[in-house]
């Protein structure tokens, strides 16, 4: 009987050891997943960043995937033209060519949210409107209304996009605007570690959905659009977009949930800042700026300092990078540096040594 018990005890001990071994392995495996939370106000470039991760570290976009973007590109073209035609009325600009009044009426009749084709009549009307001096003046005054950053890119490419065998390029896909509603997760494997990138909607109405994303966050990746210093919110036309971004950043970095998460600040759209700073002066919107006019470098350093100064904890380092989310090589380079930072900060915890 004693012998029998001894055998049973041995077997039980073996089973317990196996269970403990499996539990340790499960814990170790769970720790090899890094959760990166992408935050920022609407249109700061979060979704574009996720697309870049898919191109650089994932499977990219197949021909079938690209075809799925055709109608969204068409919708972006019509949406941009609608925005400018509406703004022509609001800011009281006339068309230079009288016929474009008719073209504008025709384009306004197209529902840009459901359009799936780009017919030759619409193409002619869009090309004529885009060439009109009135529309060009309206485009130059785009900070006075809401217009997507990619408007010029698509409108300059209407002839190519209107081709019958059109297939969106990676750049077309990166620039397409689809507001993020809900939460998008994109996991990718890098050196046997899973990076789980979580993109949440940036518009105010989307932010209440973030709360359950806050657990076990390795790093906060906060995006700021450098070019938004002179723009107002989609939701409120008397509030500056960059002030909203600053307020959100201050809230995020002081949240109790994130006290153990590293913070990486992406100052995005540096290309648009370089373009805009030549005619729209930072000092007109941020009087404390004492740098030179038309100095993109000085402007972006000032904006970086504004955000870093919001950090109340002297022991917490804010890691910052200037980015252009539509430039794959720039993002490849920046994310390699970010990955190294994250891994260095988590060597022990994630069993990487």
Swiss-Prot record:
Pfam families: G-alpha. GO terms for cellular component: cytoplasm; heterotrimeric G-protein complex. The keyword Nucleotide-binding applies. Residues 264-271 are annotated as: G4 motif. It comes from the Eukaryota. GO terms for biological process: adenylate cyclase-modulating G protein-coupled receptor signaling pathway. InterPro entries: Gprotein_alpha_Q, Gprotein_alpha_su, GproteinA_insert, P-loop_NTPase. Keywords: GTP-binding, Lipoprotein, Magnesium, Metal-binding, Nucleotide-binding, Palmitate, Transducer. GTP binds at residues 40-47, 174-180, 199-203, 268-271, 325. Belongs to the G-alpha family. G(q) subfamily. G proteins are composed of 3 units; alpha, beta and gamma. The alpha chain contains the guanine nucleotide binding site. This is Guanine nucleotide-binding protein G(q) subunit alpha.
């Amino acid at each position: 009987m004693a012998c029998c018990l001894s055998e049973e005890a041995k077997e039980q001990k073996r089973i317990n050891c196996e269970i403990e071994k499996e539990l340790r392995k499960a814990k170790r495996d769970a720790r090899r997943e890094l959760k990166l939370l992408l935050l920022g106000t609407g249109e700061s470039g979060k979704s574009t960043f996720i697309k870049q991760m898919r191109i650089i570290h994932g499977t990219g976009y197949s021909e079938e995937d690209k075809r799925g973007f055709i109608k969204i590109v068409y919708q972006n073209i019509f949406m941009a033209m609608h925005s400018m035609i509406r703004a022509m009325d609001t800011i009281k600009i006339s068309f230079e060519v009288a016929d474009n009044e008719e073209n504008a009426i025709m384009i306004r009749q197209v529902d840009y949210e459901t359009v799936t084709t780009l017919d030759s009549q619409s193409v002619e009307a869009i090309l004529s409107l885009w060439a009109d001096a009135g529309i060009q003046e309206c485009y130059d005054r785009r900070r006075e209304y809401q217009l997507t950053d990619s408007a010029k890119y698509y409108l300059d490419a209407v002839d190519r996009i209107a081709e019958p065998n059109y297939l969106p390029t990676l750049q077309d896909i990166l620039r397409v605007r689809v507001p993020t509603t809900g939460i998008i997760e994109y996991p990718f494997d890098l050196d046997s570690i899973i990076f789980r990138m979580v993109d949440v909607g940036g518009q105010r109405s989307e932010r209440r959905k973030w709360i359950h994303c806050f657990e076990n966050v390795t790093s906060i990746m906060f995006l700021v659009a450098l070019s938004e210093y002179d723009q107002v919110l989609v939701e409120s036309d008397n509030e500056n977009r960059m002030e909203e971004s600053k307020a959100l950043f201050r809230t995020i970095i002081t949240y109790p949930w994130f006290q153990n998460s590293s913070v990486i600040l992406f100052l995005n759209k540096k290309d648009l800042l370089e373009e805009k700073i030549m005619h729209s002066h930072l000092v007109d919107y941020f009087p404390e700026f004492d740098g030179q006019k038309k100095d993109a470098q000085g402007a972006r350093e000032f904006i970086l300092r504004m955000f870093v100064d919001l950090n109340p904890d002297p022991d917490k380092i804010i890691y910052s990078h200037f980015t252009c989310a539509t430039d794959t090589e720039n993002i490849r380079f920046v994310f390699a540096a970010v990955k190294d930072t994250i891994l260095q900060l988590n060597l022990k915890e994630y069993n990487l040594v």
